[in-house]
């Protein structure tokens, strides 16, 4: 019977090994620095990663250098990476193949044992962070005695919590004991949960993650010279952020308490990795290195064996791979060049569109409205946003001037005559949009792409009055436009390949992820959300308390409850969305009279002066409450799960998107569906809903961990 180490080693048969290349560098003050360069032999498209074979080789290399240090042959050891990369962390393709908790624990132990050799080398050790340092890549640096960073390094981070695991090669213990608890909370928890935010080199220096920063022109030479100063005793390294007795006695616990409350309100209790990471950071206050590392071993073993890490990896692959090769997209060489953009409307949404198009495409953008005052206000709003970007250092002054000059406004549609792309941002009413496009078509060329931002109307019907409906496409953004990464690109029956290709290429130029959908009610995101919100409102209107609804939906792990989501999108908008879906599918979607009453009332939740919810508004509860038999939270949860499984199954059967993966990609990018749920379909498989209503799962094999237990389907 093979041991856990044997099984871990077996995973390395096809690993892209990052090798450890050693060369001796004479130090200016005398002596030798052994420089280890990590390099996987691939180009910049494949960052160096740390799989089992890589760790074994690095460990053997460091053992050899320790022996040389003991013999007086080297006076310092440093590790750096190939151009642009230190290391991008663990080889996630290998981690996701781990077959058991024991093997996961062995991987954590191997990481600790290997990287820990930098702490036990017998001479000063350095890591020269010459580029990207993520996860295990940063943990290499944390194990060393000293760290330098290249000011051009792309990113520095511990993103593990974002992926459903924790820093488990020393990061959760070493970092708080190096930079203090507040900085560690930012790097380990806050940044990953803010859509995987990373540190710039200057930020890492300010936090104390690294000791000194050098420019890229002579980074290696400067780092070696600095290391020589440290070894020779000329350079003193200050560590002002290392926690002292007062921080450990008072500040540490207070910061953990604040973080715990923040997690409860922003993340909830479903996602495991943030809470496990918080426990590790809390324990790092009093534990020694060995105890802290052992706790990391157990934490990684638990999380890798569970479902959430595997769901996270599924979602990660969707965003990193599938989103870059959209299903159903025509060849990119069919796309027309977009050299000028017209935006119909001058309100807030139109301004967001114009700002995005001018900033990303760097082409003239014209907004239009029937009222000159609204046009002027819209242009000023856009230009003001551009100037703010310059003030924040996001763009240069020269670029700001160029962008401002590219934005103009008009009340005359004839100014769209030479536009290659026209998008509308007008009221969500069929007749209004039909009239807009009929008027636009009269002045633009036959090849101009017409794009509608409709969220619920039929694109085909919007184009009913067009002479050339083949150049109309749905281009549905999500709010806020600058932040949300998804665009649903809607192919109506008449939309031709050149138009669709132009839409997909334009979305990519806007730095958005585009998913091709058929012209069906709600497309993907709104149809799924309409099902969820409709079931929530139906439950309340038939006797179930709203508190029960929130308990029922909590296991979905969504960033907000159904009622919070309704307030966010707007109660009137929510009522319209439910009405639209009920009209299309009256037997499956609830038309909520209670929601219309709430829209007139204006709110669902009772909030304090800072906008924090205190509970349900009593009048709102009365307005939406109805008679009937109250469901328990478990009963309602099962009803919603089965309803979602049924609706998504119908969407796939009807060809709204190509595959379940596209549904999940839309929900992750457009609705904030948690990575650790993997979107909707892996969750619906895990709880048995897909088998109950469809007789088969969405995924075969299921997206689950090695310790997954099949639910009962009774």
Predicted regions located by residue number:
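Structural motif
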Residues: 33-37, 76-80, 126-128, 148, ...
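Gly/Ser-rich catalytic serine loop of serine hydrolases
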Residues: 127-137, 196
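N-terminal glycine-rich phosphate-binding loop for ADP-containing cofactors
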Residues: 6-16, 20-29, 61, 65, ...
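Glycine- (often His-adjacent) and acidic-residue-rich active-site loop
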Residues: 45, 80-113, 133, 162-165
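Conserved catalytic cysteine-centered active-site region
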Residues: 114-127
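Conserved CoA-thioester-binding segment of acyl-CoA-metabolizing enzymes
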Residues: 2-80, 116
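Amphipathic alpha-helical repeat scaffolds
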Residues: 47-51, 130, 453
